[in-house]
Amino acid sequence: MPDDNTEPLTIDLTDNPISRVQSRVIPSRVVRPTETIEPHLAHARRTCAALAASAGNPPLKLKAEFDLVGIGRLRTTSLENFAVQDQQEPKDGSFTLSFEYCGREQLIHVCASEAVYGALRKRLFDHELTVKSVSSATASKLIIEPLVSAAVSFSVDRTRDLARITLRNVVMLGTTTYALPLECLDRNLIDSVVELVTTQERTFYALSIAAAQHRKLG
């Protein structure tokens, strides 16, 4: 799993400032004592499980491009291998939806020097990309497979009454965590996460920004 503080290799694919931060906390109002996170997480898990069950055959078609700075664009054409994994400890309803962006064409890059080769290779591995290396006396070559492992994790911060949504390699390479007040984890937000995964629709970012602005005014 890549470090949350690793800078993404890709350029920002959205024009939203929220997509350029590694962690964003949306301030919360006082949560009602009777409100619990379990129903919210349960609905999110059911929605993600339904996606995983329906997306297997045939695979979902989606053209995506991951811009690798200094290398080129890694292109994929489908979403495959969806799965839902529950967090084992603590068993608080947290879970992860994992999947893969899959394509057909490898991305080949000849490095200008051994130093560049080593730095690029490390950063590619940090993002869990599948990389083959070919070295000779005169050149070092990176062959990047058209496969990007991605995940969306839903978890809990009970000490602050927050739900956390972590996107890893979704739309762009890198990991970003959104900490949201419990009441923000509603049907619209959950559906927007699914739309972000399956269509790259950016409603999720807009809802997150709207939630932050609403609480600043409140």
Regions found by a protein language model. Name each.
Residues 2-29:
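N-terminal, Lys/Arg- and Ser/Thr-rich interaction peptides
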Residues 69-172:
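Hydrophobic-cavity lipid-handling domains and compact docking modules
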Residues 6-10, 65, 204, 214:
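Generic N-terminal initiation segments characterized by hydrophobic and/or small/turn-forming residues
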Residues 28, 54, 58, 126-130, ...:
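Surface-exposed polar/charged interaction patches
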Residues 47-50, 63-65, 119, 123, ...:
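Charge-rich, solvent-exposed alpha-helical interaction surfaces
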Residues 21-66:
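Contiguous, amphipathic alpha-helical segments that mediate oligomerization or scaffolding
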Residues 13-16, 28, 32-35, 39, ...:
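Alpha-helix boundary/N-cap detector
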Residues 141-218:
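Glycine-rich, aromatic-bearing surface loops/beta-hairpins
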